[in-house]
Amino acid sequence: MFELDAQRLAERIDTVLDILVAGDTHSAIHNLEILKAELLSKVKDNAQSGTPKSPWEI
């Protein structure tokens, strides 16, 4: 499984929350879409890396 930097993720979420508090919902949604795409890309890259799966992941 890929390494997830929880601190970095929390900072990104905090930024989105700050944007929402400021009232710019369009930018907040855009930032969430970017974050989602980055996370899905990491998952896809991990799946293609050929790392053997644990029995419960098959």
Curated annotation (Swiss-Prot):
InterPro entries: UPF0509
Disulfide-bond pairs as recorded: none
Superkingdom of source: Bacteria
Pfam family name, one: YciZ
HAMAP family listed in its UniProt record: UPF0509
Similarity comment: Belongs to the UPF0509 family.
Name used for this protein in its record: UPF0509 protein YciZ
Species name: Escherichia fergusonii (strain ATCC 35469 / DSM 13698 / CCUG 18766 / IAM 14443 / JCM 21226 / LMG 7866 / NBRC 102419 / NCTC 12128 / CDC 0568-73)
Recorded name of the encoding gene: yciZ
